[in-house]
């Protein structure tokens, strides 16, 4: 499996108490994946961590083989990864919800005009913004290389994950023009 097959799900913080618990900073929208016996990968290693206990109320986690404070200190600042395949199995989406990794790299269209592709998703307080890398033909015409489309019904009509396409309203090209 390549790095593209994995997604960041959490960052581990400082130790809490003397028994090996560490603070877990959830980087996903799915806290349900952090439960007893769940396993995660550590970046740039083949090591897997298995949860022995997770306390949701204070976001602390205890991993097998790290059950004392000195051993647990080794985990501070590590990033936990989950395979995309396992994320699909354990994280249930509601209607019209999508995984970030499914949205990234989708082509963005307004009618038959290809505007560009999604390169990042930013969270604002109220909604999400799709960061779009403009299609080369728009850059050649002196439009910006990057622009943002809010993930709101007013701008996004349809997302087709299978075709990796996002269809926007007429206001999307207006955003590109005025960026």
From Swiss-Prot:
It comes from Campylobacter jejuni subsp. doylei (strain ATCC BAA-1458 / RM4099 / 269.97). Keywords: Chaperone, Cytoplasm, Ribosome biogenesis, rRNA processing. This is Ribosome maturation factor RimM. GO terms for cellular component: cytoplasm; ribosome. Binds ribosomal protein uS19. It comes from the Bacteria. Belongs to the RimM family. The lineage of its organism: Bacteria, Pseudomonadati, Campylobacterota, Epsilonproteobacteria, Campylobacterales. GO terms for biological process: ribosomal small subunit biogenesis; rRNA processing.
């Amino acid at each position: 499996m390549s790095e593209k097959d994995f997604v960041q799900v959490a960052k581990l913080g400082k130790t809490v108490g003397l028994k090996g618990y560490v603070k877990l900073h959830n980087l996903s929208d799915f806290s349900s994946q952090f439960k007893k016996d769940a396993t995660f990968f550590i970046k740039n290693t083949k090591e897997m961590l298995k949860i022995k206990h997770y306390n949701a109320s204070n976001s602390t986690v205890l991993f097998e083989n790290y059950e004392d404070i000195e051993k647990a200190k080794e985990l501070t600042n590590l990033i936990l990864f989950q395979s995309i395949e396992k994320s699909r199995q354990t994280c249930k989406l509601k209607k019209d919800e999508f995984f970030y990794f499914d949205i990234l790299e989708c082509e963005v269209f307004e009618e038959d005009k290809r505007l560009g592709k999604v390169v990042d998703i930013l969270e604002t307080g109220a909604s999400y913004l799709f960061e779009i890398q403009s299609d080369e033909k728009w850059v050649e015409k002196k439009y910006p290389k990057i622009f943002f489309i809010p993930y709101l019904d007013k701008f996004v009509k349809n997302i087709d994950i299978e075709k990796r396409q996002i269809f926007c309203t007429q206001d999307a090209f207006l955003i590109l023009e005025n960026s």
